[in-house]
């Protein structure tokens, strides 16, 4: 099982959940039914934990993000970057299995793939601020 790929898929599913009204169970079910590569490559338990964790702690996660934005409001953050932040903040605040530096580094790697260089610095700054508190 590939944790890096699983984290990336979790972010993609979180992004999809921001665009429609499906809950995490429906989203994950649809994903598993339609995944075209070898599903054994993914840690489905981890993906489910991320989706449920973000969904159940969204208000707390968004509050942590909002408190650590400098001259920004959370509704100005692109949906992709917000999903990356939510995943990473969930791991920082609610998932003791993931070391903090791993959560931040993986978030930055996902940002490099799905966003732009300015976003990498922005997300790094927000996550570092959260980690310091």
UniProtKB/Swiss-Prot annotation:
Keywords: RNA-binding, Transcription, Transcription antitermination, Transcription regulation. SUPFAM superfamilies: NusB-like (SSF48013). One of its GO terms (biological process) is DNA-templated transcription termination. One of its GO terms (cellular component) is cytosol. Pfam families: NusB. InterPro entries: NusB-like_sf, NusB_fam, NusB_RsmB_TIM44. One of its GO terms (molecular function) is RNA binding. HAMAP family: NusB. Belongs to the NusB family. Involved in transcription antitermination. Required for transcription of ribosomal RNA (rRNA) genes. Binds specifically to the boxA antiterminator sequence of the ribosomal RNA (rrn) operons. This is Transcription antitermination protein NusB. It comes from Clostridium botulinum (strain Alaska E43 / Type E3).
């Amino acid at each position: 099982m590939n944790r890096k790929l699983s984290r990336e898929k979790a972010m993609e599913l979180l992004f999809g959940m921001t665009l429609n009204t499906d809950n995490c169970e429906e989203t994950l079910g649809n994903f598993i039914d339609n995944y075209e590569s070898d599903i054994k490559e993914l840690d489905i338990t981890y993906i489910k934990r991320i989706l449920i964790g973000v969904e159940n702690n969204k208000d707390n996660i968004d509050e942590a993000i909002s408190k650590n934005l400098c001259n920004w409001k959370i509704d100005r953050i692109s949906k992709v970057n917000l999903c990356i932040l939510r995943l990473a903040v969930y791991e920082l605040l609610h998932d003791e299995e993931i070391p903090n530096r791993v959560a931040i580094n993986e978030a930055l790697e996902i940002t490099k793939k799905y966003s732009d260089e300015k976003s990498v610095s922005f997300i790094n700054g927000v996550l570092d601020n959260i980690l310091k508190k």
